[in-house]
Amino acid sequence: MAGGRRGGRAKRRKVCYFTSNGITHIDYKDVDLLKKFVSERGKILPRRVTGTNAKYQRKLTAAIKRARQMALLPYVSGE
């Protein structure tokens, strides 16, 4: 039988972390918050994985890049 499995649980819609918590400003110095949106390899996680909306994804990307330049976040993970 060709094709994928039918049935099962429906995927839950991801909600934006920032809009649900009322965060309007993303600070590049808040490293603990930024680490939630970076993979273990140091890559910025895409919107389809995190569920953030486009506006906050752009702000998040700028904050992560700024934190990397200020040496608050690594560019790659140290393995």
UniProtKB/Swiss-Prot annotation:
GO terms for biological process: translation. It comes from the Bacteria. Pfam families: Ribosomal_S18. One of its GO terms (molecular function) is structural constituent of ribosome. SUPFAM superfamilies: Ribosomal protein S18. InterPro entries: Ribosomal_bS18, Ribosomal_bS18_CS, Ribosomal_bS18_sf. One of its GO terms (cellular component) is cytosolic small ribosomal subunit. Keywords: Ribonucleoprotein, Ribosomal protein, RNA-binding, rRNA-binding. Induction: Strongly expressed during exponential growth, decreases 2-4-fold in stationary phase, part of the rpsF-ssbA-rpsR operon. The operon is induced by DNA damage by mitomycin C. The keyword Transmembrane helix does not apply. Binds as a heterodimer with protein bS6 to the central domain of the 16S rRNA, where it helps stabilize the platform of the 30S subunit. PANTHER family: 30S RIBOSOMAL PROTEIN S18, SMALL RIBOSOMAL SUBUNIT PROTEIN BS18M. Part of the 30S ribosomal subunit. Forms a tight heterodimer with protein bS6. Belongs to the bacterial ribosomal protein bS18 family. This is Small ribosomal subunit protein bS18. It comes from Bacillus subtilis (strain 168).
